[in-house]
Amino acid sequence: MVKSLHCLIGIVLFLAILNAGNGFTLDRSASIERQEDSWPKISLFHGNQRKNDLKKSVSPTWNKLSRCPVYLPTKSDTIRVVQIKGYFAEKKQTIITSYCIIK
């Protein structure tokens, strides 16, 4: 019984570490299109206006927790989603609160 409990706790901790990932927090509204390689693609919206012209910041700021540079993703950037706040089915929109740009 005790060994089973320790094993279960170990598995849960292992999965939690796998899911944690590296990311920085930046609140943005985004829609996700699933790619074949399972990395999500992000398209940023501001109201009804699609933000095609987002540029990466010239001098990135650094998040103290994750050590990830804070860039604004462009339409063509591929990102790894780390944390999702909620999904709105009627708008097919997801609020992503943490992500990393994949280079």
Curated annotation (Swiss-Prot):
Record's protein name: U-scoloptoxin(24)-Er1a
Tissue: Expressed by the venom gland.
Organism whose genome encodes this protein: Ethmostigmus rubripes
Family note: Belongs to the scoloptoxin-24 family.
Superkingdom, taxonomy of origin: Eukaryota
Signal peptide extent: 1-23
Subcellular localization, as worded in the UniProt entry: Secreted
Post-translational modification: Contains 1 disulfide bond.
The keyword Mitochondrion belongs to this UniProt entry's keyword annotation: no
Record's keyword terms, sorted: Disulfide bond, Secreted, Signal, Toxin
An example molecular function term from Gene Ontology annotations: toxin activity
Coiled coil: none
A single cellular component GO annotation: extracellular region
